[in-house]
Amino acid sequence: MSDASPVSLVCCDVVGAAAADGSVLERAFAEAIATQGVVTGTAAYVRSMVQFDRTRGWSPADVMHSLFPGDEIRAQAASLAFERSFHAAADRFGILPLPGANDALDKLTAAGTKVCLLSCLSRPAFSMIMERLGWWQRADLLLCADDAARGFPWPDLVLTAILRLGIGDVRDVAVITASESGVLSARRAGARLVVGMLSDVHDAARLRRAGATHLLADIGDLPDLVAANGEVPAMPAHRE
């Protein structure tokens, strides 16, 4: 057994790691860039979708600025269009908790572990997700892109959670995320456990390359992993 102190904070990147978005993000992104003339069937559309995949976990505003570098007007217009499309797509396709997510959050809280639910989405988008999931009271802290200077892949959101919740050591933190950029953020923040959630966001190979210390196919296994300070197998091969 390790002499390490127990994990006192779990930061959960909601979309992908704890909730399924039913491709709402991708649909909203495609609709948003279409307002700027980037439409299906064009080379620009293909490049944009590659960039969307590469930047999963980034704030939508940062993604749009990466697509339209030096063109602030188009980047801002696309960001506004994304916000509108995201809400509309969520109405059409829904956002649901992953199986086991509610129980996992309950078990972490019951064990005395602080929980931060976070996302690089804007406050209105994140608030809408919390409302749909009924998770306003599920965590000790809720953070979105508007609460930190930078989103993923930078460490700001995780570090903000650490500061606001009074965690004394970054090594007492676990982060669970489904995106490569989320893993990078957790590593840069110094989290001890960096858990990659196997989903339709990024695959096991990408999460491992980014620095995930563990992989989970079921968020229901997270409380046991945290309780064991990461000293249990959690890198299944069947979801490669």
Question: Where on the chain are the PLM-derived regions?
Answer:
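A short, structured active-site edge motif that brings together acidic residues
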Residues: 48-52, 135-151
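Conserved SAM-binding loop
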Residues: 18, 97, 115, 175-176, ...
